[in-house]
Amino acid sequence: MTQQVDTLFINALVLTMDENFSQYHHGAVAVQGDSIVAVGPEEELKQEYAARAQEIIDCGGKILMPGLINAHTHVPMTLLRGLADDLRLDVWLMGYMMPVEREFVSPEFVRLGTLLACAEQIRSGVTTFNDMYYFEEDVAKAAADAGMRAVCGQTVMKFPAPDAASYEDSLQMARDFIQRWKDHPLIVPAVSPHAPYTCTAEILRATADLAKEFDVPLHTHLAETAFEVENMRSEHGIPVIPYVKKQGLFEAKVIAAHCVHVDTGEIRTLLHARAGVSHNPSSNLKLASGFAPVVKMLEAGLNVGIGTDGPASNNDLDMFEEVRLAAFVAKAVTNDPTSLPAPWALLMATRLGAQALHIGHLTGSLEPGKRADLILVDISPLHNSPSFKRAADNAYAQIVYAGKSTDVSDVMVNGKWLMREHQLLTVNEEELLAQAAEVAKKIDSFLIEREQSVLSKLIALGGSLEQESFEVQVKVKLAGPDPVLRALKGPEIDIVRKRHYREHDVYFFFDEPSQGRLRYREDDFIDDVKGIVTNVRARLTLLGQKREGKFEDQVLLSRSRYIAPASQSLRFYREYFKPKSEIAIEKDRQRWLIHYKDTEFFVNLDQMREPELGYYLEIKTRTWSRKDAEHKASLASELLSVLDASSGEKVTEDYIDIVHRTAPRVSEA
């Protein structure tokens, strides 16, 4: 008896993307419920199913193929598209994306961004995407509402996130999310430790354990930039892939995004771990991250898919463009036009992509038993005409080298239509665009206000920030250090501790003097016995000092100083703050914390080495009231005499002002 089917597609060029690259030039596909029941020549399937098919669709000679699989993205970031471009990855991520996300990301933001992304992806023939973001359960809800298939990974990292104050909270969110969504017909829940550089070893181990416990994928970024790999070598003595292996990450079903900077041995490690890899050519090109060794990965037998990455670093979700770029880049970097031919490029975006996401049993090819995730592609438009039939691979080449996302006319996922004749059926495109425009206005206002203030940009980076401090201080120019060194041994002074370090300062100057000056400082702490550097500390200080008062002996009361840890490189801060000019200073500092008449003072003996300006003595103490300041100013004057420095030339300028007056700026931004 003839089997009943819901839909019979006929008159199609069927590209199955199965292991044999089977194709049918006059082909047909039969769908019942959520699955494919038959694929083959049109006449055979018409004879078998036409009589009892609820709907017969004449494809008009279009290509009928598996839906494309976006193997790595961050779909809610459609709402951040075009926000910050032409920046290095660290400046883009730490300087713009994360501050804006901390301010704006919410469940509502995530749902809107996801629906917007679903509309874009459906239009470009994507039926499955692999996501990593915050509030991932809301990504899952929106994707399911739109009818798309998705692997949704709840982000976990060491920093406070928009959806969690700690990594423990994120981990619990991931656990709850996985438990609620396991075995959903469209959504595969996952856990996503963001990257080795944003996660501790403990987090990597904990997320791997969670993924193993529920047998779900683990999605992460690995070896995206050379900087990441160099830092890993510097801190742990090994590259990224061996490091995460050591943490047990590969005991889980890993989906590794990027893998740009991996060698042959690391490729073997990924293969033996059965990890999937997402190649993201547009993002890697735009952020200048490098060229992933895709051909070597494929030759080794790795499952490598293709991803768009997030819309804020691409800036679109067009998988046709990604497939084409993947093929072109592979040819360029190998100097071989036969590298990554069209059938294999398309395979990466279909069956290999599904296998990389560990869902190859569900989707990725048109085969009986797999889900009905399929698309129709018109190859008759002007940009894809004429069509040749001479070579077996012509259809693949037409899609990869000349096809556009606008050629996709129809999309089905899990046996349900998401788009018919270019009309979206599950999302309201006009409403989404209007809502997105309103969000963009709010983000614009936030960034415009922030960009007007160096302090606001400093605060936006996150981390601790020590605000206004009041200091009583006095500074004198010395002929040499010996008198002070002898005086410090006197009975009137109680030395609590001493430190010796070299200070490397770079001061940023801005167009508007009211912005103050930003100092990037690296302190090299020196062991005087061994003569070696034992520790390095980096800090940012925003100096907008106002002189609140002046006492006897040129003792000053000053305020307005903001201090934050500097966790990024000098290059990062230069590109982030965009100073008009800068000056570099180097000095050798011996610092004592002392008690004088039951009052705490810092005594700095400084040798200005670059430029060479000789020796200076600074005496400083903090104060919190005018009366206290007057008392401490008097003691500071006494200390000048006790330290045999009262005859030195009094200096009321900061070091940068002395240098600024005597030396030219070292660079103009």
Give residue ranges: language-model regions.
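Histidine-rich, glycine-flanked metal-binding segment
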Residues: 1-7, 14-65
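N-terminal strand-loop-strand beta-hairpin
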Residues: 462-598, 645-669
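Metal-coordinating catalytic core of metallo-dependent amide/deamination hydrolases
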Residues: 138-267
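Active-site gating loops and adjacent loop-to-helix segments of metal-dependent hydrolytic enzymes
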Residues: 79-112, 149-168, 226-253, 273-276, ...
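Alpha-helical scaffold segments that flank or form the walls of functional sites
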Residues: 81-147, 170-183, 437-439
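C-terminal cap of metal-dependent C-N hydrolases
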Residues: 18, 371-429
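His/Asp/Glu-enriched, well-ordered alpha-helical/loop segment
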Residues: 246-253, 295-383
